[in-house]
Amino acid sequence: MSSSVTSKYVLNSFSSVPRLSYAKSIDIKDSLTDLIKIQRDSYNAFIGIDQDVDSGIKNIFQSMFPIQDLLGRAVLQFVSYSIGEPQYDEYECIKRGITYSVPIRIVLRFIVWKVQEVSFKEVKYVVDEETSEKSIKYIKEQEVSIGDLPTMTSYGTFIINGVERVIVSQMHRSPGVFFDSDKGKTYSSGKLIYLARIIPYRGSWLDFEFDIKDILYFRIDRKRKLPVSLLLRALGLSNSEILDTFYDKIRYERCENGWVVPFVVDRFRGVRLSYDLVDIDGNVLVKANTRITLRLAKKLASDGLKKYLVPFAEIQGLFIANDLVDPASNVMIMCAGESITSEHINKLKLFDINEIFILNIDFLTVGPYILNTLFLDKNISYEDALFEIYKVLRSGESPSLDTMKAFFDGLFFEKERYDLSTVGRIKLNDHLGLDISEDVTVLTKDDIIHVIKKLVLLRDGEGFVDDIDHLGNRRVRSVGEFIENQFRIGILRLERMIMDYMSSVNFDNAMPCDFVNPKVLATVLKDFFSSSQLSQFMDQTNPLSEVTHKRRLSALGPGGLTRERAGFEVRDVHPTHYGRICPIETPEGQNIGLISSLAIYARINKHGFIESPYRKVDNGIVTDKVEYLLAMQESNYYIADASATLDENNRFVDDMLYCRHDGNFVMVKREQVDYIDVSPKQIVSVAASLIPFLENNDANRALMGSNMQRQAVPLLKADAPLVGTGMESIVAAGSGTVVLAKRSGIVHRVDGLYIVIRAFDKEKNEYLGVDIYNLRKFQRSNHNTCINQKPLVKPGDYVRENDVIADGSAIDQGELALGKNVLVAFMSWQGYNFEDSIVISSEVVKKDVFTSIHIEEFECVVRDTALGPEKIMRSIPDVNEDSLSHLDDVGIVNVGAEVSAGDILVGKVTPRPPVSLPPETKLLVTIFGEKVFDCVDSSLYLPIDVEGTVVDVHVFVRRGVEENDRSLLIKQNEINGFIKERDYEIDVVSEYFYDELKRVLVNTNTEYNNQNIEDYLKSIPQKSWWDIKLSDESVLSQISDLKEKFDSMIENAHSKFDQKIDKLNYGYDLPQGVLCIVKVFVAVKHNLQPGDKMAGRHGNKGVISRIVPVEDMPYLEDGTPVDIILNSLGVPSRMNVGQILETHLGWASVNLGKKIGNILDNIDELTIAHLRNFLDQVYDGQDLKYSIRSMSDDDLLAFAERLRDGVPMAAPVFEGPKDNQISNLLKLADLDVSGQVDLYDGRIGEKFDRKVTVGYIYMLKLHHLVDDKIHARSVGPYGLVTQQPLGGKSHFGGQRFGEMECWALQAYGAAYTLQEMLTVKSDDIVGRVKIYESIIKGDSNFECGIPESFNVMVKELRSLCLDVALKQDKDFLHDRKINN
């Protein structure tokens, strides 16, 4: 089958070059365009974008209202709700450090009824005579604000207090009923104990379980267990009703020779009777003690056996089905459920009972479990049962019957306290075969009875327990559901407050707004977004880490598992994960298997279950119809693998195929196949799908590869991989890092900060308006990496909706570019690549190949103190002028200044209390009138390990406080930006409308003022064109319409500008006591250096051991030195062969590019044909081949020019090129098919003994930078109690000389060194001072004293009342204080 190009080639300067791909499957691109759909859809369902559809918010309001006061005198009703617009845009919220939120307002109606009389217990209402309804005293309706709701950004994140956060989706056990067993672990006998659990969405859990004696118990909320008969009686069932419910009855009729019983085939399967089987005519059919098989039983039935005889004595030991009472004397003969004894048989004869009903309990297929449980507490009444349940859950209270009944009903049968949710009801119905409406989200009596029945059947050996790790039993809770739950909690609190307020307020003066406190809801939402385990600081290292974080699934969090309790089963890969959850991408630590990632094509349905897409197969022919299946549905079908071979009619070539069915692989005929996978890569996540040749790697290394891609730092110049997978452009577009065109149109203007597009409809007929895109320049991400967007388009380009028009960080031509393509050699070099170490060429460092920019934020807060306000100023006490050279007149560092450790970023002084001056100083002050310094330096200094360039400064001045010059300058720059935007918009609008006006006027072909109208228009200003009056009414009407639209758009541009200015002039709300906040952003350049961690995409990670001069690096025959040397021993044991195949394919890619470059360098008419022919060979079997043949010469040259650096390849997951295809490409590039070349030693110029594998590999620089880790201390802070140096880089601490290090010195016998380490170099306070003195004096002698830690230990022992003292010269040295 021919391979295809990953994207149709469009000759745009801003589109990426299509990749040479060997994929056979068809991608469903629609599913891939929106990678954060899971977040967006969930949130939209909660807020209700479409108010007609029931949303989460609307349902909550409707369930809470109406609220009436305790006596029913007034009622508060919900009318409608509305969601406002955010006050500030996303960037402004990050900048100001505030939450990106929208106001929620509800319309409430307050009705007060007319009342005649109000007593303690009831209210008498005035009734309207006409309607017979309660009379209304008055109605008040008002719109009320109930608080702000954090809203989702366009990228699927939330901005909380200026920080971007992500709400991670949670996998949890679905509401419903689950049947399980203890797997024989509870009792030493290994007997299986079966249990059932009904889990609601909200409310009490109900468990049923057997014990070792096969008595059935129940528990509520894991409290003490009680016999299940108590629960059944509390549901209102009597003993006989319980038996009727759980057991079948068999009718026994008396005759002369015994009891006549109906013959039922199923009851005789494998039975051995102790008596002869005799029909009612007395014929012996089967002798006693003969085993009756199912086949024999069926033969007897077919021979006409309807009834048979049971001897009188043989009913002994059976159980009577209902109470037996003598009709004549009303004497109770037997109670329901009693076992029949010989005495009972005699009574049956005595009282002449001709008909009895027996419970169908045979101890084989039907056990007496319910019956035995019933006889534990046979005589307990309905009231006693309620009391027993109440006593377990609310011990120590003595309730009334009504209280107990209300309490029991509230546990499972009232919507306010118990909610199964729609999902729970569907699962219950499905599991138990019920047909109860989905609207009934509480338990019913039928539910409980059917659960007990199914559990008893399990104990009897029928059916199977549930697999709790099956994705049909686990659902995903996404962001909308979490916020809905928090919203409900907030609204319930609000409801209680409203009811409290209603009991004390005067209704005559009350308005709806008086009842609502907006802070209640805001507090609950703030707590969730700030502190919930699932509200996480967004991983913003690079675009991939953003996407992956939003698509993450966690089993941890509230209502989920904990790391400590989670076993192997829940962490393991399950067959139902196929196409739903990635089996590769998961953390390596203690969270392994608990945190996973959604597969590429998977989606989450409205009930929270994960669906995977499949193409429908009809009678062996694969159709283009794509259907999404749930895990539960999938087990019923035969599903073929995407790699199955199809002919040109999409029919399976093979007669028999391997298919997945019910968790197993089976071989079936092609006509039996129901579905086929849409793509081989549908089983993996976004990160894993970016690894080329994934199928050639060990799964452990693939896991590391997908995790380390998320740690890659965006580099100074992005470089898309030569060997990709075809997913790079999709991830880039879905990440939110690039700028996508909102609407189709023509690019009007481009600069470093703005892209202005004149938008049209799809047919380019109707003008829609102006789209202005603000590019993000040198902004700081959550992980201090640099966000910088660069335009790809140029004026005049036509762009379509969702085209990439600007690259972001780690994006190259709209493709994800996390690392660099470098020339690699797999060999050892002087032992410097021992144990995965990496050797790098100095040329790589010199050319800034792996240089990255990191932006650090520093904040200076100016407060109002008790002694007066702090001040930002340039004149700082005791600081010389040279140290202030990079500050402006205000005292704030200039943008563009180069700063290093210890430099002042913001000069600030703080008032200090006046000190008591000595008399001579007072005299000088009196004589000269000089004011002594009454302030102290509290400036913001650059920390010790930072050096870089100031790229931005933000100054926030409290509203009402006078702004400084720097603040005014920054504000003016912002206003200039707004003016620029407004003018751009007006320019585009004017250009379009004046063109349209000119077209209308010129098309009239008339003269105006005795000259041609086109010439006349040139002679007057454009503004005057509107004043031209023509005689044609239709033309005047057209001009009038154009003028109206023109004025409207210009007015709109001005109003948007005015709004922005108003927001800017509004000022900043800062915390209490804060006058001003200055934020300084410093860009730090990190060059590659030894100690930095690097990795490929195949889990091949290592640390740079040495940067070797370029002239010493091994080089190729043409003199090209290699960039990087990797250890070839790192491949076989790790089994990540993908890196070698990538190297070969990269080698072919670059050399094909060089070959194309050589042809281009000598281009003429003959060589153009040669070029076309060569490209035809390169793209052989590709769709692009036909485009190349039909391209014009100019287009062909432009296309070939972009292939100079290498022909981009795609090796999609499970569809990478095979070894013969790689060999063909190497041959085409005139290379050895082994992929190995002769290398020469750069130091001595000799050829190495054997050929070396050389090629191009894509390497990433990870965010484990040596600059952030290496640390040294000479002098620094000490701990207060122990007086030992602090530990850790963040505290500028020292290295701990620990227990084992002391042993090492002991082993060497270095006694004096050891003594120094434990005393003067650590916590001997006196000794430290003395050694400092002796160093100053030049003396080399010192004495060691007692370490402070020893004194601490002595004090602690004394606190335990143990008197510890030092012994010296046979005397005890007590602490003087103690002796005194």
From Swiss-Prot:
SUPFAM superfamilies reported for this sequence: beta and beta-prime subunits of DNA dependent RNA-polymerase
The record's disulfide annotation reads none
Q: Which GO terms describe its biological process?
A: DNA-templated transcription
Q: Which reaction does it catalyse?
A: RNA(n) + a ribonucleoside 5'-triphosphate = RNA(n+1) + diphosphate
**Which Enzyme Commission numbers does its entry carry?**
2.7.7.6
Chloroplast listed as a keyword: no
One GO cellular-component annotation of the UniProt record comes to: DNA-directed RNA polymerase complex
Q: Which residues form the signal peptide?
A: none
Query: Keywords on this record?
Result: DNA-directed RNA polymerase, Nucleotidyltransferase, Transcription, Transferase
Q: Which domain of life is it from?
A: Bacteria
Example of a GO MF term: ribonucleoside binding
Q: What class of enzyme is it?
A: transferase
Record's function text: DNA-dependent RNA polymerase catalyzes the transcription of DNA into RNA using the four ribonucleoside triphosphates as substrates.
**Which NCBIfam families did the record assign?**
PRK00405.1, rpoB
Q: Which family does it belong to?
A: Belongs to the RNA polymerase beta chain family.
Q: Which HAMAP family match?
A: RNApol_bact_RpoB
Q: How does it assemble?
A: The RNAP catalytic core consists of 2 alpha, 1 beta, 1 beta' and 1 omega subunit. When a sigma factor is associated with the core the holoenzyme is formed, which can initiate transcription.
Listed name of the protein: DNA-directed RNA polymerase subunit beta
The gene coding this protein? rpoB
